[in-house]
Amino acid sequence: MVALKSFRHSGPSFADLVPYAGLVDNGVILLKDGSLMAGWYFSGPDSESSTDAERNDVSRQINAILSRLGSGWMIQVEAVRVPTADYPKESDCHFPDLVTRAIDAERRAHFQKERGHFESRHALILTWRPPEPRRSGLTRYIYSDTASRSATYADKALESFSTSIREVEQYLANVVSIRRMMTRETSERGCFRVARYDELFQFIRFCVTGQNHPVRLPEIPMYLDWLVTAELQHGLTPLIENRFLGVVAIDGLPAESWPGILNALDLMPLTYRWSSRFVFLDAEEARANLERTRKKWQQKVRPFFDQLFQTQSRSLDQDAMMMVAETEDAIAEASSQLRAYGYYTPVIVLFEEDQARLQEKCEAVRRLIQAEGFGARIETLNATDAFLSSLPGVSYANIREPLINTRNLADLIPLNSVWSGSAVAPCPFYPPASPPLMQVASGSTPFRLNLHVDDVGHTLIFGPTGSGKSTLLSLIAAQFRRYSGAQIFAFDKGGSMLSLTLGIDGDHYQIGGDATEGGDGKALSFCPLADLTTDGDRAFAAEWIEMLVALQGVTITPDYRNAISRQVGLMAESRGRSLSDFVSGVQMREIKDALHHYTVDGPMGQLLDAEEDGLALGSFQCFEIEELMNMGERNLVPVLTYLFRRIEKRLTGAPSLIILDEAWLMLGHPVFRDKIREWLKVLRKANCAVVLATQSISDAERSGIIDVLKESCPTKICLPNGAAREPGTREFYERIGFNERQIEIVATAIPKRDYYVVSPEGRRLFDMALGPVALSFVGASGKEDLKRIRALHSEHGAAWPLQWLQQRGIAHADTLFPAD
């Protein structure tokens, strides 16, 4: 016979070390000891932009929630740092030109570098062990209804657990953004079969192996310990699935804590899982434990022989006296039930295929923990127990003896969330799953910048001169081209968008200057009365003529208004549509004289009195208005009013962006102020976002529509401003909702590198992460650069970007712009 005993007998396996038994309800797992477990994903507030009072308030609320729990409960807060390389795919972007495509390709390569960027995800696990049946048997006699008496122990335990976690979830939802880990079902084989996947079980599998993937549950979801198992090799440096496992334990707590004391751990540029386990004790159990500690220290206050012979040597241990006082304070807190006590076990788990690299990472984590004032050690003999203690639902392994209270726990657990932005464009008018506007950097954590909050994309950008405002606007315009059918209308000052506009073969108009030419080389002139097709067109034309007359100091009377409307109606049926045709046809001398300034015989005739309109609006239009702004109100207002009208007619639902650089020039004029107010209220329906950029904070405040700007522009981007803390400027930031900490961030940020974005979704200080290709087109705004760009454009035409990049020393320029 074959000796089969050695094959039939097996020792304990890894499945015997984990407690998971079965799935008993949606998102609820039963453990082998009868405990029930549920989990949530959550995102806490951004403490980097919060004041000390706000951080303390969050910690106070978390303590109030956790102090309700007692013996039998355990909470585990997990912070997972994972690599991210989810830059929008090239196939999801629709850049119509080589320049913006090259800029985005450069940014994609930057953000997809190996081990380049990481982001944090947070989870919370609650475990409850019901009291034994013999201890809860009396409760069935308290209730008189038949259902309560006939319900089984398991049903009552599950109902009690569901009620408790629902209350905890409701309380936590007031502090953090939270989502329950649920069981989901999908149809297979033509809806003949239903497959079940549980998010909590998937997270457990991730904690065990470090690999995140869905796990299909069996028809009867029991014996889950065998599904979650992995190959474990025990040792000083254990191996799981052929990957080395490192565990760093936090074992020395400082004398005091404050909210977010370990937030630096949540920003490290490496992959790890930080587990914080807390096993709750009832007030009675906590007092009993604390009383034993008090007696131990009390015995050390007086020397042994003084206690033995009842003498008074007056040699007292002052340290022991302090410990007794602190322990008595802790007993009082436990008795008040304002704070709960329990056993706290924090560990950081790392996986790595190379043992030497794992050791380096563990030492880096240990150094960071020690720098924060904590003790830390890299586990060796205790590594397996420490790893087991980090797994969801494991309450028996690696119990750390000293008690801490829930107020300290609220300071220690990872609640801070670095806002990473939406992974898709939040605007519902864009195609589903459209990529975000652009990805920028902030340390080792990337940030997806979107101007939109739901369907509102209006944005306010403000900061002092020379802090990088024009570069940001140009990059926003370049990255906005990723959306199919996108159209951009920019009002520029100083030629900061000239290089980008010419590079993408857009239309650049220098209105009112000596070189009044369009992008096609033809002289730019307007024929505002060219389109009189609809009643709306004729109404605008009549109103526009009335405005010209009023700007010349003539009071509009009903007779004048009727004469203007009558002449506009006649012109709608004739071929001549120029302003001179209108003047020759209108019968009132006062109107003729008032409009003389705008005809070919006057100084503005070159712009406003053309037979045909020279403005052909394309998908990217840039209007240089610096010269126009210096021509006075009588000349400025008619031109911009007409341009605004032409742009409004182009807004048919395609993704659109209107950029107003140096918007303080427009905020100071009643006509444009009212137009901006109107745009902010109605253009969102046309899928158009308005970006207002200004360097004059005082002008924005005096504009009279600062409240409209604050309410209608949910996204605000602040440029570094060293004067933000000074009186006068501080009040403006406070008026738009900034707190003391946010003002401090703006004041200490680095000009031309840092930008601070604030929206209802979150707050973040970011860096645009510009490469040399992007800088060549969005950052070239100096006079010498613009002069050289104009010369190259004149000499090489559409091929000038290649010459420009080669002159700037970019070696791979020929690969970005291949010859036809």
From Swiss-Prot:
Q: Which InterPro entries match?
A: AAA+_ATPase, CagE_TrbE_VirB, CagE_TrbE_VirB_cntrl_dom, P-loop_NTPase, T4SS_component
Pfam families associated with the record: CagE_TrbE_VirB
Q: This protein's superkingdom?
A: Bacteria
Give the range the annotation lists for the signal sequence.
1-15
Alphabetically ordered keywords of this record: ATP-binding, Conjugation, Nucleotide-binding, Plasmid, Signal
Question: Which molecular-function annotations from GO does this UniProt entry contain?
Answer: ATP binding; ATP hydrolysis activity
Keyword check for RNA-binding: no
Binding residues annotated for ATP, in chain numbering: 463-470
Similarity remark: Belongs to the TrbE/VirB4 family.
> Which PANTHER family does this chain map to?
TYPE IV SECRETION SYSTEM PROTEIN CAGE, UNCHARACTERIZED PROTEIN YJGR-RELATED
Please state what the protein is called: Conjugal transfer protein TrbE
Q: Which organism is it from?
A: Rhizobium radiobacter
| The gene coding this protein | trbE
